[in-house]
Amino acid sequence: MTNHYIDLKNSDCILIMGGNTAENHPIAFKWILRAKDKGAKVIHVDPRFTRTSARCDYHVPLRSGTDIAFLGGMIKYIIDNNLIQEEYVKYYTNASQIVSSGFDFQDGLFTGYDAEKHKYNKDTWTTEKDAAGIPVRDYTLQHPRCVYQMLKKHYDRYTLDKVSSITGVSKELLLRVYKDYGATGAKDKAGTECYALGWTHHTVGSQNIRTMAIIQLLLGNMGIAGGGINALRGEPNVQGSTDHCILYNLLPGYLKMPYASMDTLAKYMDKYTTKSND
């Protein structure tokens, strides 16, 4: 959860997928309605029409399990219509980094797939580096193998016709959602996504969230009031116990616990700090 419930009131567009917030998370929904009272658009994408749907601006029924296709279409729409928050994408994501020439994707599979083991060898999943070991970047985002162009190529297949046929959502309704949420890429706007177990309990639950993370990064909706990706948990204190380090294996900020052998801060930092040549 990147933001807190009260911060939902600062959003200009709230996309609810994989959850029934009004019934299952009424306190969180209070702040969603506060945003709606201030003019925010609230969209509910769900196979069922629920109390949440009734309180939103509009409901989008889709086939269960087709969330990734739905979001993939939004990624293509954002890129094709140049709705990205360009400064954020260039300087605060890896979009400008150049992907190694050994990496590619064909027929839905990435390079390195082992058909017998059903696993990937990720040795080619790297970026090019200069003599100092620093990732090579193209801040124009025009290099054919920069992350942004590779992303554009990958999602080019998610046409409106294809997404509509997979999800069962009409092209007109898809465009309505994509236009409303894509508008949050403007510098004075913020959009947030709220999800619950309707996303996480799928076998592709992690991929659902990662796909939405791509959208939020493209629109610059991370790290701002009214933005982020926010979990509506299925148990009373799942989020609180992790955020406030009540669990035995975490320190504040989701930092890992040290081993007994790490008797100095330097040893702890050496073990857990990401190495960088920048």
Predicted features along the sequence, with ranges:
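Extended redox/cofactor-interaction regions of prokaryotic respiratory oxidoreductases
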Residues: 1-27, 31-32, 38-40, 69, ...
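Glycine-rich phosphate/diphosphate-binding loops that line cofactor/substrate pockets in enzymes
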Residues: 4-12, 153-154, 176-192
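Generic recognition of stable, solvent-exposed alpha-helical segments in well-folded globular domains
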Residues: 9, 23, 27-30, 37, ...
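Short, well-ordered beta-strand core segments
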Residues: 14, 42, 59-61
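Long, well-ordered, tryptophan-enriched scaffold segments
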Residues: 50-184
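Acidic/polar loop patches that form or flank catalytic/metal-binding clefts of enzymes
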Residues: 84-89, 173-175, 190-193, 221-231
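A glycine-rich phosphate-binding loop feature that marks nucleotide/adenosyl-phosphate handling sites
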Residues: 91-97, 180-181, 196-198, 228-239
